[in-house]
Amino acid sequence: IVVAADGSQEAVDGHAEVAFCLINVGAVRMYLGSSEPPHTLVRSRLLYDDELYNPSGSLISDGQVALRRDKEERTVLAQLAEVSDVPVITLTDGPVELWGAKSNGEEAAEFQEQLAAYKAALLELKRRGAIAAGYVDKPAANLVVRLLEVAMTPEIELPDMRQLRPLL
């Protein structure tokens, strides 16, 4: 079973007439080698009013929005992963480890709060026996698709793998 999630965000623009922020996360769960169709999920969250501001009254940063998106991606993966007799692999765009911790101030407090929720999602994946992986590559690359193609190809056909494209 492969479960993958990717997110995007529209950061708050302090100069816009209406201040808002949007976090989107899309996910898919596929049962390789099964006739069962993939299960998809899209979750969007609109942040506005008080959600856009730190306790001091300043707008949340782009980094804080990205952190919330990362946390939401892992939360969705934990929800879609299931305990199974076959391996469950979860994939996200980007590293598994969170970077960008601040040492003090409001962003540090936000980071610690989001990190706790992020770690809870990773612990839930572990409890369900899922393998969590992050992937970093250049835009428009299809190496993950190629990896899945290799993984699903019978061993006897691997010598011809350069000509085979079962997922395209």
Q: Which residue ranges define each predicted feature?
A:
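Long, contiguous domain-sized segments
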Residues: 1, 62-89, 94-168
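Acidic, metal-ligating active-site segments
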Residues: 10-56
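Two-metal-ion RNase H-like nuclease active-site motif
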Residues: 2-10
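Short glycine/proline- and acidic residue-enriched helix-loop micro-motifs
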Residues: 58-60
